């Protein structure tokens, strides 16, 4: 038999990967090689998902602002342009929150920008 001097290290690494693979279906949570591949893929998906979430929320905010502004008779790009010209520093998240929760304040804001 060949003597293995890194047994503890390998066991720790295997345990770490199998712990990360907990909850995966079938052999994806039982066998090290397959679990390792699935963990790497899951981490990659998680990384991309965190980047994608920022884009999706920004587009959601823009959609909400656009819908609220169209009720007042203008469109999104004109509204944002007039906000910038008048040096009103509200970001899209705040504007979308205003449009959803406090329509009266949002109406006042659109009147200011006209």
Curated annotation (Swiss-Prot):
Q: Which CDD domains did the record assign?
A: Ribosomal_L20
Q: Which UniProt keywords apply?
A: Chloroplast, Plastid, Ribonucleoprotein, Ribosomal protein, RNA-binding, rRNA-binding
Keyword flag Lipid metabolism: no
Signal peptide interval: none
Q: Where in the cell is it found?
A: Plastid, Chloroplast
- Name the PROSITE patterns for this protein: RIBOSOMAL_L20 (PS00937)
Q: Which InterPro entries match?
A: Ribosomal_bL20, RIBOSOMAL_L20_CS, Ribosomal_protein_bL20_C
Give the GO biological process terms.
ribosomal large subunit assembly; translation
List the molecular function annotations (GO) for this entry.
Answer: rRNA binding; structural constituent of ribosome
KW Electron transport (keyword) present? no
Q: Which GO terms describe its cellular component?
A: chloroplast; ribonucleoprotein complex; ribosome
* Superkingdom per UniProt: Eukaryota
Q: What is its main location?
A: plastid
Which Pfam families does this entry report, sorted A to Z?
A: Ribosomal_L20
**UniProt similarity note:** Belongs to the bacterial ribosomal protein bL20 family.
What PANTHER family does the annotation carry?
Answer: 39S RIBOSOMAL PROTEIN L20 (PTHR10986)
What's the stated role of this polypeptide? Binds directly to 23S ribosomal RNA and is necessary for the in vitro assembly process of the 50S ribosomal subunit. It is not involved in the protein synthesizing functions of that subunit.
Under what name is this protein listed?
Large ribosomal subunit protein bL20c
């Amino acid at each position: 038999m060949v003597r293995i001097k890194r047994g503890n290290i390998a066991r720790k690494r295997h345990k770490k990967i199998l712990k990360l693979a907990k909850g995966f279906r079938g052999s994806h949570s039982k066998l090290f090689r397959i679990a390792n591949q699935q963990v790497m893929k899951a981490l990659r998906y998680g990384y991309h998902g965190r980047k994608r979430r920022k884009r999706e929320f920004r587009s959601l905010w823009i959609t909400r602002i656009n819908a609220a502004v169209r009720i007042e008779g203008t469109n999104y790009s004109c509204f944002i342009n007039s906000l910038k010209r008048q040096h009103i520093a509200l970001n899209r998240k705040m504007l979308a929150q205003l449009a959803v929760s406090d329509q009266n304040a949002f109406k006042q804001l659109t009147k200011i920008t006209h």
